[in-house]
Structures are given as structure tokens and as C-alpha cells.
Amino acid sequence: FYGDNIFRLFRDDSGGIIRDPKAEPEAKILVDQPRKPVSRLDVGTEGDTVTITTGKIRVEIDKKTSLIKIVDLKTEAVAVEQAAPVLFEKGKTTLSLKTGPEEYFYGGGVQNGRFSHKGKVISIENQNSWTDGGVASPTPFYWSTNGYGLLWHTFKKGQYDFGAKEKGTVNLSHDENYLDVFFMVDDGAVNLLRKFYQLTGNPVLLPKFAFYQGHLNAYNRDYWKEDEKGILFEDGKRYKESQKDNGGIRESLNGELDNYQFSARAVIDRYKAHDMPLGWLLPNDGYGAGYGQTDTLDGNIANLKSLADYALKNGVEIGLWTQSDLHPKPEISALLQRDIVKEVRDAGVRVLKTDVAWVGAGYSFGLNGITDVAQIMTYYGNNSRPFIISLDGWAGTQRYAGIWTGDQTGGAWEYIRFHIPTYIGSGLSGQPNICSDMDGIFGGKNPAVNIRDFQWKTFTPMELNMDGWGANEKYPHVFGEPATSINRWYLKLKSELMPYAYSIAEESVSGMPMVRAMFLEYPNPYTLGKATQYQFLFGPYFLVAPVYQDTNADKEGNDVRHGIYLPEGQWIDYFTGDLYEGGKIYNCFDAPVWKLPVFVKNGAIIPMTGPNNNVSEINPNHRIYEIYPHGRTSFTTYDDDGVTEEYRQGRGVKTRIESALDGSNNVTVTVHPSVGDFNGFDKKKSTEFRINVTRKPDKVS
């Protein structure tokens, strides 16, 4: 037992003792101290049944069949029960469990295009498959609405059948010769996710700059030659890019070779010139790029530091993409040589993005690599908080990194469509930090899709602008008007919502994800399945229904959205203020090209800040609360230094805000004293209240 309601079942008929799963390279699924005290442990016999009882569950083992049943003592209901003996075959073990007709299942990691698995089969397998139906980052963990979760303690691939082939039975298998699983029993998603985190680690809280758009490309490899069909640059000429020397101008990070407009520095300038938010930059995201053109690794590190210094002056952090091993190897050329310690300590790297070139083998390999990087970034980066974006992960990845969904083609509605349930499912699998490329890495040339992708991802954790591979440049201003202004507006809105987003991000470290399935707040037969897979909640107060298809669009992209389910309560169109009654499904919702269908729940309290382009522009001495008075509601904001690991030691500040509307339409807003502290926290703040009302107030006091 790993606590009163976590039970480990280990069985190896070949005689092996309880152990960690084999991992090459070495990695650990469990944290160093996964156990919690057990309040009591009573073993008894009742007829043909052996019982093991803790303070919260009773494990019943049938003497004749060895089948196991686990009862939740709080309800005296059976949470989970074996349907058949464990089946051991050569290189495969199968566990069969009973399931009821009203039971639903979630988890399995980043299962592209899916989140609710009742009656389906999912692969717990490193597939390197990035489109609908593929698996971008598997996790051998799922949970049931019946009140249990299961973690299979293995690095081997598996398959989970939730009643697809055999109705009434869940068949779970992994390519392993023994059984090692953890049963977690509790009520609700949050409690079961917390049990999963107890065993495998809490998700990281991303640094604040990570919530801003990032730009990724290679700026140390290609040559640019004038071509009338090429890309238009600031000098008024068009250039075509080539990875081979075509007689053109070679790019570099810092633009010191009369090549500034092709440099990484120019990217930062470009975002500033177009007044677009930018939080971070990866200048080597491309095979064979490197980050310097000198004959030595140290010379290239100095080149990288020069870019980092320039970026930091402009409020932007830098990071690196990984192609090769991150530690020096003499046989590798200076161009591709890596030294992650010097990159972090000397050059100031604070972001790392993995790819199939490095972690594509998946399973323990990806977990091993990011474990190393996370420790180095903190130790050599002045206790800096690692920002790692990975894929091909496993159980435990969440304690070090966020996930991106891989390489896909933008410019098509399918790109948006399948990503919505993908994001929802990632959070239900214990990985709240999920992202994808803005309008895809490939394709493009569809302004409507580009705009709609920027819109809905305003209400997600991260945004990756992966440039250099598409049919057009991947800048938010690339399509001109109206796309430029619309994309800027939503990027600015994302920056304004930072206090709200950061607060729900902190909440996701110990439970409820940021991007929430509708049933997490409003469970009913309609929300538990796939009916609401194309909408979600962003925290407790925003309901987002992305435009994910061409329903009846005109040539400008103005359209309507069908099938928006508003749960019980009152919902307000965030952009018009129109009030909608919940408990209904709305069709033909007007969605002109500028407008994302997004609703705020009446009673909401939204902490905000002024529009900004990066974290350094946020005024720490001014706080904004936007309030929609209705009944009695509350919200607790969270803040910390946003850059270090000190939040893990409790260095943060929480502030509770309450709103109360009485029967006489009197509104009382209470901001309680802040609790906590962190380095740089200023207790003296001005406060701005934005209280949404239906008419001018009679009096304010």
C-alpha cells in the first residue's frame, strides 16, 4: 500500500521480486518518495474471501479464483473488480476488469483527436504519429468515473480496450512478462489525478514567459538569394531560402555579417515593429543548424550569449532545439557540438525543445533526457525554472516538461478540429501543459484557419510559432489585414489574462487542468462522452467553443458555430455582453471572422493586467479585477516570481476575491489580504475594478 487508497498489485510467476521496470537508458516512473502513511491495515478472512482493509478501502481476494475486488469504504461501493484471472502469455500480460454501462474512461496520454474512451481501444505506444488517431505522447494511466484509476508500472508498450471487443469488460495489456499495477480509489478527477501525481510527480508550473507566444526556426544554416517569387524582406526585395550554398547571403544569429534582416535578432525586431507579444525564441530549430559559425564550441557559446543578451534587453528569453546529445562529444563538429551546462550557465538558455531526433525512441529514453536537462537548468541557471517542451513522453514526463503534439499541416480545418479533444484529453491524463504549432509547421496560406487558430489558443497554456517549413512564413502578421489586427488583438488578450491563466496553472499542479473537459465542472450524461469534444472550459469561468470547420463561411471567413452547449447557469458573450441562459444547446451562433465564441460565466471574477508584449512590461504594482456580479462567487489568485523554482518551497502569494450580489442588487466586492511572500513581491498595489453592470450604478462606496 502506498497510502490508504493506493494499492500496488505485483505478480511475477517466474519468481522475480518487486522491482522497478527495466529501463534503457535508466529512468524512473515513480518519484523518490511515492508512499504516504497508511492509517491502519487489517487482514482478515470472511468465508472464501481474504480481506485487507485500510482507513479508506477494502481489498477482497477470492481464495478459489484469486480475483480481486476493491471497495470504497466511504460509499461501500465496488470501485473496481477483476473480470478474469491475469493472463500471462509469452511477452504479454493481460488484466481484465469489469465495467458498467454508465462508466466512462479517460487518460492514456496525448491521444490525438480523443479524450473519452468508453467503447474504444487506445494504444499506449510510442508511435511518432501526429495526426488524428495517432499517439503523440502515451501515458500508461487511466481513470474511471466509477472511482478508480490505474497506473501500469512499465516502460513496455500496451493496449487498453475499454469494452470495444468485449462488452462489459476492460482488457488491459502490456508487452511485459509480469504484472505491476497501482490501483487508486477516490471520487472525482481531481482526487484521482492527485494520486497519480503522488506516484509520478506533480506537473511543472511553467515560467511566466512560457505563456507568451514563442518563435522557432533555424537562423544559422541557410542562404538567401534574391528571387522575385521569394519572401519579401525589410529592404523591399524578395529572397529565396536554401539549405545549400546557392551564392546568396548566409544567415546568422546576430546579423553581424551584413545579413541582419536574415538573423535571429531581426525576428525580435520584427515582432516589436508589428507590436506583437513574444515571450521566447528558439534560433536553432532545424537539422544541421547549430548556433554559431566559429571553429570552437566556446566560440559558438559566445555567439549564443550575444543573442541572449539582446533578447533579454527586449524582454525575450532564448532556448534551443535538440538534434544531438546535449553533452560534448569530440567526434562531433563544432557546428553541432553541444554543452548544455555552458548553454545554460554561460549563454543563458532557459528553454529546451526535444524532438524525434533526440527522444524519438520514447519510453524511458525521453524521460531520461529531460530529467537530466531539468536538473542542469535549475542547478546552473541560478535556480531557474525549466521550460522544456517534449514529446514521446511517458508517465512522469509531466514533472519535468510540457508536451507538444508533433509536426502537422496547417491551413486546413482538420488541424484545429482534432486538436481540441487532444488538449482536453492531455489534461485528463495528468499533463496539463499541452501545446502545438500555430497553424501547423507545414502548409498554411489560409487566413481564416490562421486567425481561428490564434483565437482559440488564447485560452490554452502555450503557443509555438514554428517557422521555416510552411507554405508561408509563420508570423502572426504574415497575412496582412485583417488577420494582423485580429491576431494581435488575441495575443494582447492572452497577455492581459496572465494573472488568471497563471492562477489556474498553479491549480493544475495539484489537480484540475487549465483546459478542462466540460464534465469536470458540469458532469452529466451529455458531457461525459464525445458530445462536447469541440468546446472546453479555461479555468472555472471561461467557456470556449472554437470555430473548427467551414459551416457557412463567406469569403472573408465570417461564419456561424453550431452545437454550443451552455451548462446550467447564466453565460455572457465575452465580446458583446449578451446574456444566454444555460441548460441549452445553441446553433447558428454568430462568429464573424474577428470573433471567437467565448462565454464567461455570470458571477465570474477575472484577475487581469494591462496589455503587454512580454512579462517585463507587466506593471507589478497594479492589479485589475474584472467582475460579473451574480450571487456569491469567489476566486483565489496566485502569484510568485515566475522564473525560479522557489514556488516548490511555498514561496508564492495567494489573494482571495469575493463578489456578492444581494436581492436589492447591491454588489459587495471583498479583496482579502494577500497571504504569502516571494522575492520581488510588492505589497503596495493600486487596484482597478471593472464591474460589469446592466445600468449605471446608483452609488459606489
Task: Locate predicted features.
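N-terminal accessory segment at the very beginning of proteins
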Residues: 1-209, 247-254, 260-263, 269, ...
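Aromatic- and carboxylate-enriched substrate-binding clefts and catalytic-loop regions
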Residues: 23-32, 277-487, 518-523, 527-532, ...
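Catalytic domains of carbohydrate-active enzymes, especially glycoside hydrolases
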Residues: 263-284
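An acidic-aromatic substrate-binding cleft motif
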Residues: 195-258, 278, 285
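Beta-sheet entry/capping signal
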Residues: 6-7, 49-51, 58, 67, ...
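Catalytic core of carbohydrate-active enzymes
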Residues: 375, 402, 428-433, 445-666, ...
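Active-site mouth loops of central-metabolism enzymes
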Residues: 250-260, 326-335
